[in-house]
């Protein structure tokens, strides 16, 4: 009987000891403020939700709501390299909305992937990547593109936002 209890205890210890309960990480990056090399960790759903809320506000052209998800000191870099602060970005978005409306055009996009990764889960801040497909259409035709927005999210707000675009060449057969 003692032998069976000992084997049961030993099996249970082996089972629990063999489970990896550590924080999984992968890859490497020296993209940090201290210059150290870190591994990537999975981010949180909270940071992903910030990106989803930014998208909802942009889709609805609700720039008052958008302010809730961007820090007052946010740095935004468009795909053409132009940099914006919060106020100049919203001013530019209002101009773009006006141009789209005056041309009776449509500007649509939808995301296909959102994920968050973190270099150091013990310090705040997560890198969120959002992949989009977009389309602008007016009386002259349409333009389509793929886009990646990269956000750095801290305390529920985007601190910086970079956009990268790839035009899609539509060919007719």
Describe the residue ranges of each PLM region.
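Sec-dependent bacterial lipoprotein signal peptides
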Residues: 1-17
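A mature extracytoplasmic/lumenal domain signature
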Residues: 70, 80, 132-134, 165
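A short gly/proline-enriched turn/hairpin at secondary-structure junctions
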Residues: 37, 41, 73-85
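Short beta-strand edge/turn micro-motifs at domain boundaries
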Residues: 23-26, 144-172
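Short, low-complexity N-terminal intrinsically disordered segments enriched in polar/charged residues
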Residues: 19-64, 68
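Sec-exported extracytoplasmic/periplasmic mature domains
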Residues: 55, 59, 71-75, 94-102
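Surface-exposed, charged secondary-structure patches
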Residues: 90-139
């Amino acid at each position: 009987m003692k032998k069976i209890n000992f084997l049961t205890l030993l099996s249970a210890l082996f089972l629990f000891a063999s489970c990896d309960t550590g924080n999984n990480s992968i890859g490497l990056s020296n993209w940090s403020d201290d210059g150290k090399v870190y591994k990537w960790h999975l981010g949180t759903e909270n940071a992903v939700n910030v990106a989803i809320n930014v998208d909802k506000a942009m889709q609805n052209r609700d720039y008052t709501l958008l302010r809730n998800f961007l820090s007052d000191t946010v740095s935004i870099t468009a795909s053409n390299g132009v940099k914006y602060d919060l106020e100049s970005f919203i001013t530019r978005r209002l101009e773009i909305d006006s141009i789209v409306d005056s041309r009776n055009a449509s500007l649509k996009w939808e995301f296909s992937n959102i994920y968050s990764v973190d270099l150091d889960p013990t310090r705040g801040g997560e890198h969120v990547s959002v992949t989009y497909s977009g389309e602008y259409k007016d009386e002259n035709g349409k333009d389509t593109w793929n886009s990646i927005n990269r956000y750095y999210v801290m305390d529920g707000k985007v601190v910086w936002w970079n956009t990268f675009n790839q035009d899609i060449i539509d060919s007719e057969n």
